[in-house]
Amino acid sequence: MRSRSICRAMICLLLTLMLVCACVVPGLAVTADRLTAPEKTTEQLIEDALAMNRSTVDAMKKEHTYKAFLDTVAARQQTWVRAEATRLTKVLRGMGVSPKSTVGELKTAQDPAARKLYRDICRWLVDETEDSSVLAYSQFTSAKAIEGLDLSQLIGWSALQDFVDTIVPELLRYALEALRQLGFEFPNDPLWPTLDQKAIVDYAHKYAKKYNPAYRVPTSGSDCTNFVSQALYAGGLSMTPSSIRGTNPGTKTTTEEWYYYNSPSATARTPYEYAVAVSTSWVRVEDLYTYLAPHYNTVTSTNDDVVRRNLKSGYVIQGGPTLGRYEHSSIVTEKNGKWCYTAHTNDRKDRDMKHYFNAYDKFRIIKVC
């Protein structure tokens, strides 16, 4: 029988190898101004992101591998964020915009892409309603309030946000794989099956424009991730058992649970709280990704061709702007040999994927089937 010390050494080695192989990002080692966010240190942000998957963190602590994992994540963060900041700087220069410009200068830029970027930034910083782990959006109450911000500062914020939202959940997947290869069991984890592709697509097609009455439709905000979660549930992804089912309706901020329970005794307070007990992982773009990414293979890219090569009907695709968070979830579908997407808000059924590529600048695919 192998000793615990040998097991711990093997876990550390596997984690290191998997993380290094998984996260090499090309790019020059150029640092954007003020890479850290104004509210928390980078270390605190990473800790917060990891806390979203407490069972994995607890397992690493039990095996005395958590510090090694944190060190690897921190090292990867420096490389990844700087490379991403360099890429974003090149994107801006391709629009004829200097990174030293302010947000307000984008409004009158000659390139339409730069003017679109202005609108995207406003949506990110002013219209964003979800909690953020990087920025306190409440300080930005109008477009005018952000027009004096340096683009170089936003580049750093956006790169760090992407690392927290996208890369950290992916790193946790490799940590889980390493722990499981060494026989560590997670008795409270749900089963993570390969989902039923046909069931996902059939559900998406059936309710793309005719909403399922079993689920409440929000009167404000987006229904896109709520719709995707419904399709995944139809495809065989089990809801996490919750103690609040039927007794304490409301929206629970969590990425360790995934559920939507009707609860007739609810009092209307927000669109998602009325007659519903729901997790944010069911209804928020970022939280759904954080919930799924440690357990399913993912692809992240800004290259349309790379995205196309990784599409499959039934997969989840998420899109976002050049600067800012991912903001839309859809189900990949196919029609007449062309890749399409089916979604809510706006309601689309088998809309050509080229429109998705035109609307967004970066993409994530979750391979659930």
Where are these regions (language model features)?
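Sec-dependent signal peptide cleavage junction
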Residues: 21-37
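...with weaker cross-activation on analogous glycine-rich loops/strands in unrelated enzymes
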Residues: 254-341
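Extended boundary segments
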Residues: 215-217, 226-280
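Active-site-adjacent structural elements in enzyme catalytic domains
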Residues: 41, 45-235, 239, 245-247, ...
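Solvent-exposed loop/turn segments at secondary-structure junctions
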Residues: 210-211, 234, 238, 317-325, ...
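Bacterial N-terminal signal peptides that target proteins for export
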Residues: 2-11
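Bacterial N-terminal signal peptides
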Residues: 12-22
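Glycine-rich, aromatic-bearing surface loops/beta-hairpins
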Residues: 98, 105, 112, 132, ...
